[in-house]
Amino acid sequence: TILQDFTKVVKLINESRFLFDSFQFRFRNYATISGNFDHWHIDYVKLDEFLNSTDTIQLDDVSFVYPSPSFLKRYFEMPWTHFVNNEIMELKDSIDINLRNNGASTNVDYQYNVFENSNQIFHYPLIGLSRNVSVLDYDSIGNFSFTNPPISIETNVFNSFQLDSATFIVQNIIGTASSDYKYNDTIYHTQKFHTYFAYDDGVAESAYGINIDGAKLAYEFKLNRPDTLRAVQMYFPQMLDSVNHIPFDLTIWAKTNGLPGTILYSESFSPVHTEYLDYHTYYLSQPFRIVGDFYVGWQQTTDDLLNIGLDKNNTANSYMYYDAGFGWTNSSYNGSWMIRPIFSMN
């Protein structure tokens, strides 16, 4: 089954062989090893006495339930040289933060701060220390959403004197009652502006592949100024069988009538399986200049599943295309491929 929400489970530990000082326990899952399947998460673990199997008491807690979102409208990350002077076009007007309240309805204070090199350069809200909101309990409304009004983003939120790249830390904080569980009241994300474009957040919850010889996969990107494509980063998660001996044609297409058109570049490579979610960088033998919109992807030379990493927390389907022999079509699998083109003028 596919479960999208947490469910509560009560396990009684009442056998004498467990009732001793320094008792320990662990959780183990049974999973399919042929792919990124059977993922599950443990949220709260409460060990207490005098509970029974029908106990419904939960931890009194208000917490963040999703990662801190990117402030960019189209990409998760992008080059600094393409962001500067295009802030209005590239930044979201607002973001949404979801909270879950396991206890009774309560008021919480929310704020976010932006740091560069440990120096705070921006604070939300613009007036006052924090924004106070009433968060109803989860059983009444589900997750609380900051939609009325949303959390605003100003065009000067990322202000830096750096010329080529910049890195910012975004800190989200909720202020709750002193009795509230405190280890999940702050979340961070790093907003990077380096040399690559990325729709993904760097974590593969799944994988995507086409097992058809000659099939093509193309990912759309847009440049705000002419630039030189020097490399492409890809993340191929290790599945049941290694495919690092199977070649594919890394391909760059021009945009023609809204779809991949003329091939601008093609070079043969093979998947490289890395550890710890590290991307492998494919350096082009002949870097070349690109203007405007283009596509990055590959053409298959076999019917093997190459399986590019798929980030399911960020959806970029409108920029993801495949051609299995019947023309270009948008991918119907929600997520974003873990493919990142790298640019620099030098």
Stretches with model-predicted labels:
Residues 7-10, 211-223, 279-280:
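Short beta-strands within extracellular/lumenal beta-sheet-rich domains
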Residues 20, 223-233, 245, 291:
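Extended extracellular/luminal ectodomain segments enriched in beta-structured repeat modules
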Residues 1-121:
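Beta-sandwich/jellyroll recognition modules and their flexible linkers
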Residues 1-20, 128-143, 259-281:
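Exoplasmic/lumenal beta-rich domain surfaces
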Residues 38-44, 299-345:
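Short, surface-exposed beta-strand/loop patches at domain edges
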